[in-house]
Amino acid sequence: RGDRIVGARCRRTHPGGGVERLTVWADHVFVCGGAVHTPALLQRSGIWRNIGNGLKMHPTIKIAARFPHPVDHGDVPMHRVTEFSPFVAIGGSASRKGHIAMALADTGAPYDEALADWDNIAVYYAAIRSEGSGRVAALRGVRSPLVTYSLTEADVSRLARGLVHLGELLLAAGATELHPSVVGGRIVHRLDEMGSWWDEVTRARANLMTVHLTSTVRMGENRGRTGADSFGRVWNYRNLRVNDGSLIPDAPGVNPQAAIMAIATRNCDQFLAAQ
């Protein structure tokens, strides 16, 4: 109603399958759905100005590495190589059997042969600071939002560089076989076989992933470039706030969890102090 949000309409599904439609009335509304679903919810509510644009992330390429001995799959290894920061970071990834099977699929090696002695295999990543950006758009009649992202030529080059550096590290650590997350990519056993990776990493062939999504409701004081002010209040609405990773203006090159928690705490403190 005007410059105020008065509540939210939602549906609750009961254990028996019944659906109940609810309206929750509120004096203040905080949207915390993450960098994909926060902008999608705002867009479905008719709020589009600087909402959903500028999606940022850390595009990530991986290698499944086979060692001559079993490796520990109990947890995600907390090791990280920052020698090539701020543009490339290298580290360990989740390596349970399902993750390994998925990581081995890209090169086209015979499945049973590749997965033999799977407990000798672990997955590692190279993530980049990306110059590209993306968009989140809620489409009429479609339940899930459309998410798109465009890599630049520099991004593709950094991904290839990260893959090669990661391969060099793993061979030095004793790996005997490297499967890159590149469709049809060469399986490498020695350093002198790695040169082909530079040309194999393309937009069409690289099988990338990311877990760090930000920047779809950027915070700041320039209304022409941001979706919310510096404390997460959505422009043109007195009582509507965003308080999640959508606010971070760029992907920071590291896990943004601590930054998100710090910003959310600061925004809550500012809100409570004003009441």
List the model feature ranges, each with a label:
Residues H165-A173, A264-Q275:
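Internal hydrophobic alpha-helix adjacent to the cofactor/substrate pocket in enzyme cavities
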Residues R1, G7, A175-D250, Q257:
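A glycine-rich dinucleotide-binding beta-alpha-beta segment and adjacent secondary-structure elements
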Residues G18, G34, R158, V211, ...:
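Secondary-structure capping and boundary motifs in well-ordered enzyme cores
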Residues F30, L166, M219:
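Conserved hydrophobic/aromatic pocket- or pore-lining residues that grip, position, or stack substrates
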Residues W48-L170, E177, T202-S215, W235, ...:
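FAD cofactor-binding and catalytic pocket of flavoenzymes
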